[in-house]
């Protein structure tokens, strides 16, 4: 189930990433995009990781995981893979929301 959740998060990250301009047909230099800071999250994904185990079906709650592409993960976040942030390799940091 964790693998499926990770693949869904990765799919959403790829879908939300804007296409990079090739620069063909332009006279002059390349297009410069502003640098993203740690506070500016370029991708955020909310997903359901699965239902919590329990005897009573009425009391089951979904665990929700929040993932984003960052330079470094916070204390409560878990490293879940690599992503691209402003043309540089960054980390996918996830945390569970209850």
From Swiss-Prot:
Signal peptide positions (record): 1-19
Cysteine-cysteine disulfides: 67-94, 69-83, 73-93
Entries under InterPro entries matching the protein: Alpha-defensin, Alpha-defensin_C
Protein name as catalogued: Defensin-A1
Protein origin, superkingdom: Eukaryota
Subcellular location: Secreted
Alphabetic keyword roster: Antibiotic, Antimicrobial, Cleavage on pair of basic residues, Defensin, Disulfide bond, Secreted, Signal
Record GO cellular component, one term: extracellular space
Lineage per the UniProt record: Eukaryota, Metazoa, Chordata, Craniata, Vertebrata
Propeptide segments, given as residue ranges: 20-62, 97-98
Family under the similarity heading: Belongs to the alpha-defensin family.
Function: Has antimicrobial activity.
Tissues/organs with expression: Highly expressed in intestine, and expressed at lower levels in lung and spleen.
Gene Ontology BP term (one): defense response to bacterium
